[in-house]
Amino acid sequence: HALDTPHFPQELTSALSKNICITFFSGMFKNVESVAEIFDSLGPSFKQDQA
């Protein structure tokens, strides 16, 4: 009976890994965007410090 079911967990794990990858990359891109916004808001003060 154990040999009858392997295809189902495989589909489950592949779907889970896809979801994990999607959430991971979307989270990474969100972090990159927020970091870019932080640097944009800090940009003028950095330029003032350099001047």
Curated annotation (Swiss-Prot):
The keyword Secreted appears for this protein: yes
GO terms classed as biological process: otolith mineralization
Any one GO cellular component localisation term in the record: extracellular region
Disulphide-bridged cysteine pairs: none
GO molecular function list: calcium ion binding
Keywords from the named record: Calcium, Metal-binding, Secreted
Entry keyword annotation includes NAD: no
Protein's cellular compartments: Secreted
Description of how the protein assembles with itself and partners: Interacts with OTOL1.
UniProt similarity note: Belongs to the phospholipase A2 family.
Function, as annotated: Major protein of the otoconia, a calcium carbonate structure in the saccule and utricle of the ear. Together with OTOL1, acts as a scaffold for otoconia biomineralization: sequesters calcium and forms interconnecting fibrils between otoconia that are incorporated into the calcium crystal structure. Together with OTOL1, modulates calcite crystal morphology and growth kinetics. It is unlikely that this protein has phospholipase A2 activity.
The protein, known as: Otoconin-90
Organism: Cavia porcellus
